[in-house]
Amino acid sequence: MNSFSTLKTLFCGSLLALSLVNTTQAGVSLDRTRIVLTGNENSASVNLKNTSPDIPFLAQSWVENENGQKISSPLVALPPLQRLDGAQKGVVRITKTAEVGLLPQDRESLFYLNVREIPPAPKQANVLQMAMQSRIKLFYRPSAIVPEKPGMVWQDQLVFKKQGNKFIVNNPTPYYITIISLSNKLNGEDSDKLTTFPGLMVAPKASLDIPVKTSNVNQFYMMYVNDYGGHPELKFVCQQDSCKVAPKDQQPKY
């Protein structure tokens, strides 16, 4: 193969790769990053949207348990398969089955909603297509622990214990709590963070080790995820080896 043919092949291959990248940017998107289904509700909904203006996609939906196993009870995603034409919107509804009564009633249970986009068959031969998949947390919250008011904060009940280069965080609440970061400063940069993980989740009524750059601090800010997918922060103050939430007048204003 001469130099011109080689360059032509490389150029065509680059164009094909770019077209594939652009194609995968379009697809099925979800309108939230988590779902909370309470015992007081029959179902919870997630809105879907085909972000491509002209390419139709199939959206396949299912629920997994906390171990990543596909299940059909006590929660089920309906419809399991739907077609979304270009720019069309759709809905996935999470519905309870009779077995929901077998779940713990004194704490949340964790599941995952999966939505996989299935593109149409390619018109050209030898074209690689990728089916993208979204996976978001799905919490079942029994009626007995539904907060009295929307937006109530329970993340302030966490207690951190210093132990070497780690914190042991205790979650006495019946809720899953997702911690994004611990930082020396409010809205801190990466250099201000005590943690290096992208986020971790503490189960209800459980403890978890959190590795930190240093535990030699008198205070820090905890960024967490609330029911709406927001990332507020709480200030914690330390006395000796124990760190608890700071008084309300020291908390960030939102």
From Swiss-Prot:
Subcellular location: Periplasm
InterPro entries, per database record: Ig-like_fold (IPR013783), PapD-like_sf (IPR008962), Periplasmic_pilus_chap (IPR050643), Pili_assmbl_chap_C_dom_sf (IPR036316), Pili_assmbl_chaperone_bac (IPR001829), Pili_assmbl_chaperone_C (IPR016148), Pili_assmbl_chaperone_CS (IPR018046), Pili_assmbl_chaperone_N (IPR016147)
Endpoints of the signal sequence: 1-26
Pfam families per UniProt: PapD_C (PF02753), PapD_N (PF00345)
GO cellular component, one term: outer membrane-bounded periplasmic space
A Gene Ontology biological process term: cell wall organization
Keywords per UniProt: Chaperone, Fimbrium biogenesis, Immunoglobulin domain, Periplasm, Signal
Function: Involved in the biogenesis of the PMF fimbria.
PANTHER family: FIMBRIAL CHAPARONE PROTEIN, PILUS ASSEMBLY CHAPERONE
Family label: Belongs to the periplasmic pilus chaperone family.
Protein name: Chaperone protein PmfD
